[in-house]
Amino acid sequence: MVTIKDVARVAGVSASTVSRALSGRIPVEESTREKVLEAAKKLNYQPNALAKGLKEGRTGTIGLIVPNICNPVFPLVSRGVEDTARKFGYTVILCNTDEDVNIEREYIQKLRKKWVDGIILATSGKESGHITELTESGLPVVLLIRRLEDRVDAVAVDNNEAARQAVAYLIRTGHRKIVMVNGDQGLTLYRERFQGYLRGLRESGILFDPSLALEIPEVQNCYETVREFLAARPAPDAVFAASDPMALQVMRAVKDAGYRVPDDISVIGFDDLESAPFLDPPLTTVRQPLYQMGAAAAERIISQIEGKASTPEERAPLVRVMETELIVRQSTRDRTD
């Protein structure tokens, strides 16, 4: 392995001069710099990024932990993180936890040992003790999509308000019996979406019927659960699904039960994934700015890493709430006609 001393020997200068010439931050005579660069090229010298990072106090790497890379939400978010990090000269290490909080803890410890400059975390679990420990360690941390507490920097959407607007739209277009197909209530975002569903009903004077609220922790069980629900009782007017992957299974279950979307049952999702306009029928859904959320998380973590916050207000935990939008397509209809 070629070292900085080898470059110094070939260039006829000291190792410290090679270090200054290659860093580009400390003035070095141009002729000396050219000799160093020529020697480095000749020897195919690659600087030791870790050693350089330890010396400077940074490694130029950011850890990104996501709960399920197969969930179509997270590739879009990850792309936003990576594209933005690259613009600022950072490399992203991606870790997938499979929705397992123990794997999440393990990755956090491994990333800390690898001297990453900060961690962006879309948490997989309901526990927050290890996240509190992480933030108290002093390592920059930003929570993404799934936030826990306002005392940790986070980028998310107002799930409560977005869900309320979706339900209000259904009610405004003549739907009264509205089923909610929700995820694991142990996760903040699903609790918030459920609260928005309840608020939408309450504000319209519709009494909440607990039998219309389906909690389905595993998205792959959505189809069977909805089929069983439809087989056991009269059809609802609409189904509000807490995610687009759930909405896709809801639509298939509705059709296989002999109903039509939206003629018999309207369906609304939450995400606006790239596939949503191409479903049959195209899916009405709440749009989350997923790529932009990833980009915002990267910008915030880099701001922490580079110490750009100079005032107490700027250093205080920041929860950035991104705007959502209800995208109306053909999976819902107006029942007031």
Which residue ranges define each predicted feature?
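Short beta-strand elements in bilobed, periplasmic/extracellular small-molecule ligand-binding domains
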Residues: 85-96, 180, 198-220
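Short, solvent-exposed amphipathic alpha-helices that sit
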Residues: 35, 73-87, 162-166, 188-207, ...
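An alpha-beta-alpha
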Residues: 166-206, 211, 313-331
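N-terminal helix-turn-helix DNA-binding module of bacterial transcription factors
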Residues: 1-60, 76
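Amphipathic helical "hinge" segments at domain boundaries
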Residues: 45-118, 195-198
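Flexible loop/turn connectors
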Residues: 223, 227-337
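Flexible loop/hinge segments that line or gate small-molecule binding clefts
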Residues: 99, 121-165, 186, 245, ...
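Hydrophobic alpha-helical segments within soluble ligand-binding/sensing domains
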Residues: 155-180, 192-199, 219-227, 247, ...
